[in-house]
Amino acid sequence: LQGLLLWLLLSVGGVWASRGPLRPLCRPINATLAAENEACPVCITFTTTICAGYCPSMVRVLPAALPPVPQPVCTYHELHFASIRLPGCPPGVDPMVSFPVALSCRCGPCRLSNSDCGGPRAQSLACDRPLLPGLLFL
């Protein structure tokens, strides 16, 4: 009887939880980022598409001798790269900056080769140079 009650509780909870999380699911969103080069006089902000949102995860309730369960992160599924030119760079300095543009996203393991797996930043734009705002790349 206890097994049946536990199964019923978990199945109803799963149905309720699947109706939609409180946070948006993993998806492409518009974000403003910054690009700069130490040799160029200005920093440029630009709008692009990144992956962000909630990925369902599980945590063991009881301590176990097993390794922790890997937690999925919102990461790129399909992407392409775009480039912008930093103005005012001196001769001999490459003024081009390339960045990924998310076409679609998925929940999966964190791969440091193409994702920033950290949490939210206190300051999303961090320019050491004077700011030249307003470029849009989607």
Swiss-Prot record:
An example Gene Ontology molecular-function term: hormone activity
Position of the signal peptide: 1-17
Gene Ontology, cellular component aspect: cytoplasm; extracellular space
SUPFAM superfamilies (alphabetical): Cystine-knot cytokines
Cysteines joined through disulfide linkages: C26-C74, C40-C89, C43-C127, C51-C105, C55-C107, C110-C117
InterPro entries to which the protein is assigned, alphabetical: Cystine-knot_cytokine, Glyco_hormone_CN, Gonadotropin_bsu, Gonadotropin_bsu_CS
Cellular location(s): Secreted
Chief location: secreted
Family per similarity comment: Belongs to the glycoprotein hormones subunit beta family.
Protein name according to UniProt: Lutropin subunit beta
Encoding gene (name): LHB
